[in-house]
Curated annotation (Swiss-Prot):
NCBIfam families: orni_carb_tr, PRK00779.1. It comes from the Bacteria. Belongs to the aspartate/ornithine carbamoyltransferase superfamily. OTCase family. SUPFAM superfamilies: Aspartate/ornithine carbamoyltransferase (SSF53671). GO terms for cellular component: cytoplasm. This is Ornithine carbamoyltransferase. It catalyses: carbamoyl phosphate + L-ornithine = L-citrulline + phosphate + H(+). Carbamoyl phosphate binds at S53, T54, R55, T56, Q80, R104, H131, P132, C133, Q134, C261, L262, R289. It is an enzyme of class 2 (transferase). Its EC number is 2.1.3.3. The lineage of its organism: Bacteria, Pseudomonadati, Pseudomonadota, Alphaproteobacteria, Hyphomicrobiales. Pathway: Amino-acid biosynthesis; L-arginine biosynthesis; L-arginine from L-ornithine and carbamoyl phosphate: step 1/3.
Amino acid sequence: MSPKHFLDLSAVTSADLRTIMNDALARKQAFKAGTGDKPLAGKMLAMIFEKPSTRTRVSFDVGMRQLGGETLFLSGTEMQLGRAETIGDTAKVLSRYVDAIMIRTTEHSRLLELAQHATVPVINALTDDTHPCQIMADIMTFEEHRGPIKGKTIAWTGDGNNVLHSLVEGAARFGYRMNMAVPLGSEPKDHYLNWARNEGAEIMLCHDADRAVAGVDCVVTDTWVSMNQEHRARGHNVFQPYQVNAALMAKAGNDALFMHCLPAHRGEEVTDDVIDGPQSVVFDEAENRLHAQKSILAWCLGAI
């Protein structure tokens, strides 16, 4: 039987994603009530970090432990994936030792090669192309605050990066409309836009932040230059019109939420009054990485 990988939102059915989402919402409530279960007792998760991250490491480590399992941290320098040993061979060996593998890496092809050869589930904790765990946390956060996300409109303003790619895939899988405003030359990859549109998603891409956020239910942004993507930096003057500030938020819906995956560069992509304001749910997002990923782990390992 093939392992249940969590590689991208496009690679998991809408029904399975909804199962994971509903489990995450229920699992968080149970955890808060002190009635959470430990369905992954005796299981071991290998965590490979070729790109560092505080939130990802802590949330997966704590999440696995809350489910009764254990974790093994492996840094990029320790692993030397594809250098000292092929990625395929590493995947086969790790599969003999652990029950699941989480990887945060650079090229998306490295994730896919690992999953191709692994005989245990592989989870995408981030690549340069996508960040599906973050979007599961974002959708969970939206639904906690505003109810079902289906039929709602989400706006993105800023760089066409990996978080946006997964947000676009989420539009097809969860049924929300997606508006995007990015500078010329910073558009998301056509592959993700075309896939989502072919799946029936309502996608609007423009270069005008005011147009993208008009009347929307949620405004999302991220850093203007992602980690290890400094070669794409184009200067703050290019991105300044896409800053999320009070004036831009005023053009969104009256009860629109503001989201950011963090860490944020305050005063750049978002102003203090927005990220610290009443519409901001950024720390709920960060918290929900823990609970969303617990349900992803449980789904991959057959516990839901």
